[in-house]
């Protein structure tokens, strides 16, 4: 554990420490590529801790190739050998940092949560902000403009409710509820220019099942899509994005900024018909110069026709593919056991499952690396309860390779760590550490009132 057999990794990832599940007196592992060889020995704990210097040397040698791994253990007074395996090493490095929220996998109550960042080239983790700095409130929906650590936003809920938008050294507190919108701004997607952010506005409710493998349901009784102008502090929308006859949500801009993708479902009576709500994948044109939307909505994938529902559409930075989550109904797929990752080739509009990345449990939120070669996604495949981040390589044909679990220095980490990883987002560098300053901004600043235009 973890399962690293035949996975594909980037040449700049932290060492993949692992352990044997079987009891043994001692064990050894040999990792090699050509003339480069690394032997690691361990005792009864059967934990293989790979030295960083030797690991980096191996990855340099194996870039674009693979590592051969042999594991042997001394069991019942004799040496046994496990089946050898390989670890493929891609040529393309992954973005150096990963941002995520850590939270207990509960439904309504929380005590400690925060937004954190992890250096993927080692095991360094630090807090972007923690809610102990702001009255133990809820904070969520962190988002970055084109994986840029200097341009981000996130929401605070309950106490000190606001949206904090960070642009370099500038921090703005935004009061985003208007009389014309259903709610404060919710699910974000940056325009590549950084001038706009698309958001959903949602009336969201939560319910619990008495006897169902999906423990919790989160659903919208109404939702629209809007676009926020970061320079003018204005919200704009279109009747095509805010109709009473449909639930619109999960907007995401194309890399060229001229198309806005979103999910749309026929409005239903909620919560009575919660399991009849099925979202299709749609798009509308957007003119960044005039802030005007097109007059026609295109439906790219009509999931409702096959009794399925789309959530979390995300376009690769090179514009070739759109990754989304497909489940049986609704849009809160992070608790739906049947949720899987699917891809659309935007040149052909062909949709297909990422079979190598999916499992029998939940695959839900996901994001792209800046070079369109890596995705990170949250999965409950380990125990059905906690979401953990898995990283997968996307080849030139848009197919996923076998994913690997985010490596940790301690091989028992995931058995002891009682928090879920939420909204994993690749970033190209480290976010400036100013958590206390952000908390003070939320507490003491009056904030800017956003206007509906």
Please provide the spans of the model-predicted regions:
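Sequence signature of WD/YWTD-type beta-propeller architectures
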Residues: 1-453
